[in-house]
Amino acid sequence: MVGAVALLAAVFTGTTATGTATAAGNGARIAAVGGWTCPGAAVPPGYVITMFNRSGCNGAGSWLQQPVRDGIWTCSGSPIVSGYVITDYDRNGCSGIGAWFHRLVRNGIWTCPYSPIPAGYRSTTYDARGCSGLGAWLTIRA
């Protein structure tokens, strides 16, 4: 009960709860940094959302937060960590809400719509077939 109260207080104040609590309804663990979280929980810097469980958090849905790494699929709505770009899209990924593939930026990488273009890079050639038909731009060093 104490863990649940700390988690709720953290959600409403924008801080991080200490310890872990069980997400009501499905037994998912809610971690102080990353792990399974309920709606409204802040995503820590350097983390992304990688999975969605519709029945988690007593039917409100729960999100799995993990540290970002090169070549990770993330759910639609996940933050994009600085230095990373979006290079592919799967409309059925993340339990049907859509998923984006994150890669570290490098010269000659194809990026999807909504991908940030980091400083020192620019977009050039366009391919309408890229990113599962959403279109993609070749990103090169400026």
Regions found by a protein language model. Name each.
Residues 24-142:
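Post-signal peptide N-terminal regions of Sec-secreted extracellular proteins
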